[in-house]
Each structure stands twice: as structure tokens, then as C-alpha cells.
């Protein structure tokens, strides 16, 4: 329905306008705060919000653990839907692998400046971006395809992975590259034998984050997949409106367990890399 699509586009523009207004207010407050700089005398005083912040930081993991135990108690023996589990695993693994390749190519060959637009998916509302992707997929007759859903996930996976890899890439010691070139190494050999091993731990972290970001995607999966590519997230949201409690708990528990297992494996691999390669600690 064209009228409904126009209403959706108008709602997306309204969200963008609200975000722009909030950004202007925050920028004005920051500029106003800079006019009243504190008296920097080198004397430290206890921060009044330190204790509440520490308590909140301690309670957040505990609340997540309690939520996982509650889901495990509700799920009991209800198995997850295998097609949703397979789609979630396939999309997440493919998205983080392609995202890592895109990020490494961007860092190695991309422009040094003018890349601020890469971070837009991290600050803009998800609805306008997903709506734009959906319209492109409709115009190209690609909606309902698995690879289209993967493309939709990459819009959010790549910025998050680049957010982790970019600082580590910039902190590389350029003297190692100079020494390697004096020994006659080419760019390809330097990348595979010198640069990539030095990025082992941040690359593993980026892969885990990209995996979890892909698992959590709902709007791109639903719209670009046209409802024909079920995942754990889409099934959990659908069941939350009136499904069986045990099945909903099982879907949500698997949605929690998959990123947890991925983070555990990457932490173990990072520990092994630091154990057998002291320079990567």
C-alpha cells in the first residue's frame, strides 16, 4: 500500500528530525559547558557518583545471569526451531567473516580521511536505515532472499567491527613494517605474516561482537527477508505477542547462549595466542 509506505517514510523522517534536534541540544550544552572550565589545580576529590556507578556495573552482569537462569527454568526441554537456529548461525558466521574482510581491506586500502559516514549506523535510528534497505530491495526485486538479509546485517556488523579494529590498527608499530621491507618482504607477505598476527586479539574480539550484532538484528531480517527467513530473534519477537512460554524461553535462551559461546571461544583463543606468543599479550 503506497499510503502506508508514505506514512512509514514520514515516521522515519520524524525520527531523524528528533535525533537531529537532540544532537543540536547536546552540542549546545557541550559548548556552554566548555565556557565554564573547572579550576585545574591538580587536587583530586572523591567523585560523588563513583559508588553508584560501581554498584550498577556489578549488578548488570548479575541481572543478566539471573535472566539466563530464569529462561533456562522456563524453557525446560523445549527445543529451538532448527530452521531459525540454522539461519541465525549461518547469517552471523557469514556476516562476521565478511565484515572482518571488509574492515581489514578498508584499513589497509581505504581513505585516511572522510570516512565519518561509516559510523552513521551506530548513531542513527535503525528504523530509517532498515526502511531504506527495504525500499532498495523492493526496487531490485531482491526481497525474501538470504543474501539480501545478509547484506542488511552487514550494515550494522561492519561499523561495530571497524570500531574495534581501527584503534588497534593505528597502534601498530610502523618500525616493524620498515624492517620487513628492508628484508625484501612484499606487502602481501607483510600483511599475512606480520600485520595480521599482531591483530589476533582485537580481530577475535571484533568477530565476537560482529556475531552478536548479527544475532540481534530484527528489522533487517524481517523486512529484507519478507518474513521467509526465520531467525531466533524474529521468532522470539513473534512469540512474545502470544506464543507458548516454554517455546519463547527456549528461543530467547538460544539467542543468549550463541553470543555467550562465541565470546567464550574468542576469549579462549585470545588467551592461547597470548600464552604461546608473548608479544601478543
Predicted regions located by residue number:
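Short alpha-helical segment that forms part of, or immediately flanks, the ligand-binding pocket
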Residues: 118, 177-178
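Short helix-to-coil transition segments within interhelical loops
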Residues: 178-199
Amino acid at each position: 500500500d503506497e499510503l502506508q509506505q508514505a506514512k512509514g517514510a514520514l515516521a522515519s523522517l520524524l525520527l531523524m528530525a528528533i535525533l537531529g534536534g537532540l544532537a543540536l541540544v547536546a552540542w549546545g550544552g557541550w559548548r556552554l559547558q566548555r565556557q565554564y572550565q573547572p579550576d585545574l589545580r591538580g587536587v583530586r576529590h572523591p567523585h560523588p557518583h563513583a559508588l553508584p556507578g560501581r554498584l550498577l556495573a556489578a549488578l548488570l552482569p548479575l541481572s543478566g545471569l539471573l535472566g539466563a537462569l530464569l529462561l533456562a527454568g522456563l524453557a525446560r526441554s523445549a527445543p529451538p526451531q532448527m530452521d531459525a537456529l540454522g539461519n541465525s548461525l549461518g547469517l552471523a558466521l557469514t556476516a562476521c567473516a565478511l565484515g572482518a574482510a571488509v574492515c581489514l581491506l578498508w584499513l589497509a586500502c581505504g581513505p585516511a580521511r572522510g570516512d565519518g559516514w561509516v559510523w552513521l549506523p551506530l548513531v542513527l535510528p535503525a528504523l530509517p536505515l532498515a526502511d531504506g534497505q527495504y525500499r532498495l530491495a523492493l526496487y531490485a526485486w531482491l526481497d525474501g532472499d538470504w543474501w539480501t538479509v545478509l547484506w542488511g546485517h552487514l550494515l550494522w556488523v561492519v561499523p561495530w567491527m571497524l570500531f574495534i579494529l581501527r584503534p588497534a590498527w593505528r597502534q601498530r608499530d610502523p618500525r616493524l613494517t620498515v624492517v620487513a621491507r628492508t628484508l625484501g618482504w612484499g606487502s602481501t607477505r607483510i600483511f599475512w605474516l606480520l600485520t595480521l598476527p599482531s591483530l589476533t586479539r582485537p580481530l577475535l574480539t571484533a568477530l565476537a561482537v560482529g556475531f552478536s550484532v548479527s544475532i540481534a538484528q530484527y528489522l533487517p531480517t524481517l523486512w529484507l527477508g519478507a518474513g521467509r527467513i526465520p531467525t531466533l530473534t524474529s521468532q522470539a519477537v513473534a512469540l512474545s505477542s502470544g506464543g507458548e512460554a516454554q517455546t519463547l524461553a527456549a528461543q530467547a535462551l538460544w539467542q543468549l547462549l550463541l553470543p555467550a559461546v562465541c565470546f567464550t571461544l574468542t576469549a579462549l583463543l585470545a588467551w592461547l595466542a597470548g600464552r604461546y606468543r608473548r608479544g601478543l599479550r
